[in-house]
């Protein structure tokens, strides 16, 4: 569908070109922009259009359109909003999803734009109402009902006792105090979310100066705050229980109807099974599902037909007295997941979203059609950047090979050599922002047997439980490894075959040839990676069809070693080949083969020449993340998407799944029961199986289990993260209540990049013993391919001491976690300094600063962790106020029934007397202050003071 900009209202021209919200109010049947400062402020007598523009990772924009109808808006104004929304969608390219929003029945997506809630005010423009500014009049006591676990629907109800019930949460806003009444049948998550509304009311209508009280349904007059609350209603009286008719009021089964909009009328379409083939591209359809109605617009329809279908949907709702129903309008090719799920089977839809690359092609095609020379305009798109690992790559790695019911710890020289027929368990510890972090994972080779996989899962789970769930857990399959895995191993070799008894038995039973790698045999390796800290040698079939012009290869047979360089490779690829030669064949010279100039011997080893690919093996790109709350009931997984999520959406009582297509994260709250916690990996696997977003997710997609309080940065990067929030004690409701009542809000600073406090893989070791994990040969044998020992010694004096001692200098790769190795030569050193450095290289063995992967003693590691955690701490921490008001310990805990008033909830310990402080913490205040911050928080958490 093409439209002229003359058909578009001037208020809509040039919109939707940047990430964010744009809002219009309908005034005299025209859209009038609402200033940003008034976004979220709605009047009951008005209609609004809301455009949410989201910048996607592929460079394009996604547009979501909503038209909001106040309960007192006129029918004509509502119809205008509906038609203008269709017009705005056409101006944006005809891809937006359009939502009809009715006051009191808003979608969770709309409410997520205006957190914590929408509280419409009386008044309106078109209706002749006067806008009422609440802050300008005397305070009126109001009662609100709050519903929702993830976003809150707020509705004002009459200030009478009969408005209260056991199922919901109510907020009573009085002149001097705000009460939150928690119905006995309401859940913790709803109570926590309602507290966000309490905070909003406190800040908006009381300028932040107001007391807050929480009243539990069932507490009588003996409770002071409960007594005060019930006194405002004229005294306590039992609330009636919900009747059975109320319970069953929404259980009516609705019949799905399909109607075709044809020449201004609606025609019923009969069907036995709702199939995609019923929809024709040159027509519009209404899919009536009862609570919501969908309008499907074929791509071949005109703007006028789409406007007519939109008007027909509005009229149908009015005629059937269903003004509160939601209407979702979708365009062919851009249907929502919920719409597709209504059909028996929906065919795969090609990705129609335009990226910046598509746009460049369209511009070039236009210029070419006008006779212009576009040579040079259509440059190849810049190569996509390697994803950041968001993990410190200088930690300590241990690897076990699984063999039956047991596991064998591999030596440091063998831990980066994996076999495709085996399963492995790895444990990686590294320094985080404020504590040591740990990742425990399993790696399943493509040809590993089920027996070993089951054993690996069991053994890794026991290690995870032994760590008291304070580590992250990963389940990885060969060929689908995330970037974190590669930078942890740095130099990785994956060989054919396997060494486990399970694999050997499997090939014996099936009569399969054992192709396990033999050092002196025939083998071909594809070399890949992005640098010295992320490189792999993957053994492939030793045939010429395994070659690819975009890669370099190593081929060996006995003492014969070839390197093969594809025509599309880079200097970095050549560097990686040299580095991998130092690992695979360190003692033998190699013969270089350029593509197109190979020797006959090279082709003979590969069984003759044949066709091969020149396209780089594709990698899936990370998609925009989606967060889902998960409920596992009788082996059935139910999920609900959380739109425009924040850290505050992660409730301590729940399990959430974060899906970014290339990786899947399962987040487990601290308050989740042990049985459900142990099923976290099952939840991740079920999520992949159901493929809720219809992404064609692979069952081999990496799954990470993340526990609250131990979130790694490669998870927290999806949020604006405040680590203090995840370390607080108690339920999500108790935590938010402490903040709302105490008036102290945790810091909302963005997460800091983790920088290792020490250089190297294991900072506690003596530097003279350190060596790189990517070298399999002796550290004493400092060998660089093609250089004499003397030249090597001279060159080493000029090289960065933290550089790996491999064949060629590493490329200048930007590192997220740069090593902080030994002192470097000044950038402009004198000639004498250079001579002195050269001389010292010959006077004794070079003292390597390259890290070693042998684990230090527990005592040394503990000292390192504590010392490392204090580095970078502010030296200007405020002193404890010795003259602070003193409270007993019982009144300072987060679970106290009689909490101390007007305290800083982030420093509860400073209100303890010196005697009680020493008794509870087992140390003096001075000793406590000298502890690293993470250890202070852990002790406070254990004592329920955090």
Curated annotation (Swiss-Prot):
Gelsolin-like repeats lie at residues 28-109, 152-219, 274-339, 641-715. Residues 765-777 have a biased composition (Polar residues). Transmembrane segments: none annotated. Keywords: Actin capping, Actin-binding, Calcium, Cytoplasm, Cytoskeleton, Repeat. One of its GO terms (cellular component) is cytoplasm. Disulfide bonds: none annotated. One of its GO terms (biological process) is actin filament severing. GO terms for molecular function: actin filament binding. Residues 744-789, 801-832, 844-902 are annotated as: Disordered. Residues 881-946 form the HP domain. Ca(2+)-regulated actin-binding protein. Binds actin microfilaments (MFs). Involved in actin filament bundling, severing and capping. Caps the barbed end of actin filaments and is able to sever them in a calcium-dependent manner. PANTHER family: VILLIN, VILLIN-4. Belongs to the villin/gelsolin family. This is Villin-4. The gene is VLN4.
């Amino acid at each position: 569908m093409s439209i002229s900009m003359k058909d578009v209202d001037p208020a809509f021209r040039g919109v939707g070109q940047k990430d964010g919200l744009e809002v219009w109010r309908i005034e005299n049947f025209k859209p009038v922009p609402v200033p940003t400062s008034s976004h979220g402020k709605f009047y009951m007598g008005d209609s609004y259009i809301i455009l949410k523009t989201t910048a996607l990772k592929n460079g394009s924009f996604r547009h979501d359109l909503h038209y909001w109808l106040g309960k007192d808006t006129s029918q004509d104004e509502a119809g205008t909003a509906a038609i203008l929304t269709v017009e705005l969608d056409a101006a944006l390219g005809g891809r937006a999803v359009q939502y009809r929003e009715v006051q009191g029945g808003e979608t969770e997506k709309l409410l997520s734009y205006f957190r914590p809630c929408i509280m419409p005010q009386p008044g309106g423009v078109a209706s002749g109402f006067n806008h009422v500014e609440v802050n300008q009049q005397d305070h009126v006591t109001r009662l609100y009902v709050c519903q929702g676990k993830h976003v809150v629907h707020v509705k004002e109800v009459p200030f009478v006792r009969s408005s209260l019930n056991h199922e919901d949460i109510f907020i009573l806003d009085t002149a001097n105090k705000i009460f939150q009444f928690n119905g006995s049948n309401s859940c913790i998550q709803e109570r926590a979310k309602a507290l966000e509304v309490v905070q909003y009311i406190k800040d908006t209508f009381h300028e932040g100066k107001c007391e807050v009280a929480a009243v539990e349904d069932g507490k009588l007059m003996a409770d002071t705050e409960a007594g005060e609350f019930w006194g405002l209603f004229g005294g306590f009286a039992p609330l009636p229980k919900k009747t059975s008719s109320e319970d069953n009021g929404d259980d009516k089964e609705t019949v799905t109807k399909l109607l075709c909009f044809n020449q201004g009328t609606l025609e019923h379409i009969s069907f036995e099974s709702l199939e995609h083939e019923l929809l024709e591209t040159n027509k519009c359809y209404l899919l009536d599902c009862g609570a919501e109605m969908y309008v499907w617009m074929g791509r071949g329809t005109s703007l006028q037909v789409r406007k007519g279908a939109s008007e027909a949907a509005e009229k149908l709702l009015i005629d059937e007295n269903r003004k509160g129903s939601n209407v979702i309008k979708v365009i062919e090719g851009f249907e929502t997941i919920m719409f597709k799920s209504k059909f028996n089977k929906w065919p795969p839809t090609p990705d129609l979203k335009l990226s910046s690359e598509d746009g460049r092609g369209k511009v070039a095609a236009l210029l070419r059609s006008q006779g212009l020379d576009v040579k040079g305009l259509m440059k190849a798109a810049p190569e996509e950047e390697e994803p950041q690992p968001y993990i410190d790559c200088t930690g300590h790695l241990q690897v076990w090979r699984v063999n039956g019911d047991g596991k064998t710890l591999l030596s440091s020289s063998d831990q980066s050599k994996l076999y495709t027929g085996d399963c492995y368990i790895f444990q990686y510890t590294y320094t985080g922002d404020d504590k040591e972090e740990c990742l425990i994972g399993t790696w399943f080779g493509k040809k590993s047997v089920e027996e070993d996989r089951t054993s690996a899962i069991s053994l890794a789970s026991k290690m995870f439980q032994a760590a008291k769930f304070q580590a992250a857990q990963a389940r990885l399959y060969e060929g689908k490894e995330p970037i974190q895995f590669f930078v942890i191993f740095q130099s990785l070799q994956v060989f054919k075959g396997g060494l486990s008894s399970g694999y050997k038995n499997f090939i014996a039973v099936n009569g399969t040839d054992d192709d396990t790698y033999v050092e002196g045999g025939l083998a071909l390796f594809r070399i890949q990676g992005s640098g010295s800290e992320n490189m792999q040698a993957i053994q492939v079939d030793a045939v010429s069809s395994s070659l690819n012009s975009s890669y370099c290869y190593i081929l060996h047979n006995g003492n014969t070693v070839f390197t093969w360089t594809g025509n599309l490779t880079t200097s970095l690829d050549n560097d990686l080949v040299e580095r991998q030669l130092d690992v695979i064949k360190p003692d033998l010279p190699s013969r270089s083969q350029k593509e197109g100039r190979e020797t006959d011997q090279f082709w003979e080893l590969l069984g003759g020449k044949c066709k091969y690919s020149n396209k780089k093996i594709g990698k899936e790109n990370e998609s925009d993340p989606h967060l889902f709350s998960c409920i596992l009931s009788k082996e059935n997984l139910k999920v609900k998407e959380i739109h425009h999520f924040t850290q505050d959406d992660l409730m301590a009582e729940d399990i959430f799944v974060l899906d970014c297509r290339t990786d899947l994260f399962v987040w487990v709250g601290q308050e989740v029961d042990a049985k459900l916690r142990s099923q976290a990996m099952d939840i991740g696997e079920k999520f992949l199986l159901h493929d809720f977003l219809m992404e064609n997710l692979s069952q081999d997609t990496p799954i990470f289990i993340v526990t609250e309080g131990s979130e790694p940065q490669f998870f927290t990067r999806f949020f604006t993260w405040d680590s203090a929030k995840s370390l607080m004690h108690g339920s999500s409701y108790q935590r938010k209540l402490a903040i709302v009542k105490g008036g102290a809000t945790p810091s909302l600073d963005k997460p800091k990049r983790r920088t290792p406090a020490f250089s190297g893989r294991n900072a506690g070791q003596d530097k003279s013993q350190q060596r790189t994990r990517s070298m399999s040969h002796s550290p004493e044998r400092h060998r660089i391919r093609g250089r004499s020992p003397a030249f090597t010694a001279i060159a080493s004096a000029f090289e960065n001491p933290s550089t790996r001692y491999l064949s060629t200098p590493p490329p200048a790769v930007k590192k997220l976690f740069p090593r902080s190795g030994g002192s470097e030569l000044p950038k402009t050193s004198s000639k004498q300094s250079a001579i002195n450095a050269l001389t010292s290289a010959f006077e004794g063995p070079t003292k390597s600063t390259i890290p070693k992967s042998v684990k230090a003693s527990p005592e040394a590691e503990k000292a390192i962790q504590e010392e490392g955690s204090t580095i970078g701490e502010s030296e200007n921490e405020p002193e404890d106020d010795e003259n602070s008001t003193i409270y007993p310990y019982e009144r300072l805990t987060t679970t106290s029934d009689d909490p101390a008033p007007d305290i800083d909830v982030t420093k509860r310990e400073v209100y303890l007397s010196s005697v009680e402080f020493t008794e509870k913490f087992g140390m003096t205040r001075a000793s406590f202050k000298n502890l690293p911050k993470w250890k202070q928080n852990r002790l406070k958490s254990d004592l329920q003071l955090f």
